From Swiss-Prot:
Acts as a probably catalytic component of the CCR4-NOT core complex, which in the nucleus seems to be a general transcription factor, and in the cytoplasm the major mRNA deadenylase involved in mRNA turnover. In vitro, POP2 has 3'-exoribonuclease activity with a preference for poly(A) RNAs, but also degrades poly(U) and poly(C) RNAs. Is part of a glucose-sensing system involved in growth control in response to glucose availability. It catalyses: Exonucleolytic cleavage of poly(A) to 5'-AMP. A divalent metal cation binds at residues 188, 190, 310, 394. It comes from Saccharomyces cerevisiae (strain ATCC 204508 / S288c) (Baker's yeast). InterPro entries: CNOT7/CNOT8/Pop2, RNase_CAF1, RNaseH-like_sf, RNaseH_sf. This is Poly(A) ribonuclease POP2. Residues 81-91 have a biased composition (Low complexity). The keyword Transcription applies. Keywords: Acetylation, Activator, Cytoplasm, Exonuclease, Hydrolase, Magnesium, Metal-binding, Nuclease, Nucleus, Phosphoprotein, Repressor, RNA-binding, Transcription, Transcription regulation. Gene3D superfamilies: Ribonuclease H-like superfamily/Ribonuclease H (3.30.420.10). Residues 78-98 are annotated as: Disordered. Divalent metal cations. Mg(2+) is the most probable.
Amino acid sequence: MQSMNVQPRVLAVGGEQFFSQRQASEQHQQQNMGPQVYSPKVNRARMFPQGMPVNTINGSVNQEMNNAYLLKQKNEPLLTQQQQQQQQQQQPFNIGTPVSVASLPPGLNVLQQQQQQQQQQQQQQQGVGLNRPLASQLPKHLTNQSMPPIFLPPPNYLFVRDVWKSNLYSEFAVIRQLVSQYNHVSISTEFVGTLARPIGTFRSKVDYHYQTMRANVDFLNPIQLGLSLSDANGNKPDNGPSTWQFNFEFDPKKEIMSTESLELLRKSGINFEKHENLGIDVFEFSQLLMDSGLMMDDSVTWITYHAAYDLGFLINILMNDSMPNNKEDFEWWVHQYMPNFYDLNLVYKIIQEFKNPQLQQSSQQQQQQQYSLTTLADELGLPRFSIFTTTGGQSLLMLLSFCQLSKLSMHKFPNGTDFAKYQGVIYGIDGDQ
């Protein structure tokens, strides 16, 4: 096991090195080049206090807030404030003198008791996934807008099948049967984070982004890959799985990763012992994926979110070779394997720029503005189910968000331009997004 700040590796690209082993000052500069990128699952694990146990069920984090009593405790201050406001509105005669509920007129007393009972029943019936974020937790551009109605997927949509080497072939047999009808597929990957940072002279900012992605994809191995299938309207099969989480063979003792990343991944629910013994061989996975009917077919629509790393790991697996030296060759390979795909991050960014034209004018604001998948899901009214924090759940959330956004917008941007204009464009790699 190796910390990412102790022994940087050396990778030559165009005569330059990705890491310098010469001086400690250069290592310090590399540490300040940018924050390490983590997946949503790892980011959630970073929020856990040290020493707090994390319960997992079927590889997903089991949130303990399903307990109605804990949920009531969490919302009790807000509920008390609402009750006080209601009492003030319903008690115009109470000026300066506190009046107990027992001393109120009979009709008002019964009304208040009924309202309190209804509020308590609603609080008890609400699960964790149906809780909307508080106003203080929302982005600024959402605080002044009315919340959309909740889009509640059917229960069978929220099932994620864990795939190990023991059931790899049987699950791909299911995928082959579904592809002809459910030809929209989303992908999400889990890896240890960005450890490599290129140094040297680059042709552009886009070239730097590609070389960073290229270094990390060549350097690291994926831990999990999520796939989810639906039709163009977001419909899924009534019976059986339509979202899968593929668990690859991964031995932390042989991989390059920091101690911090290892602990965060363990907290997020990754069972490295099981990955080491029961994990899927990535090249066996690539052969089955090529025969699944998903690849090299323009009738299949791929959905990603900030696609660079997801597509990078997938192309690296399918090629069984090092990443291409330049982004043009990489894009060629992507379009060969996936001729029809959308980067939902780019689509969401363009929609937000139509809503806030000043974002297009200020490059500094563009860098500060974050367009996360969770924020998009909140705007679309998708509840925050705990399954969405897993790798397979992330692919499911991408697919649900894209299909819901397409239905609400009729697959068009606010100016009437069709989403197809940005088909096959990778956010951060193609152009200066």
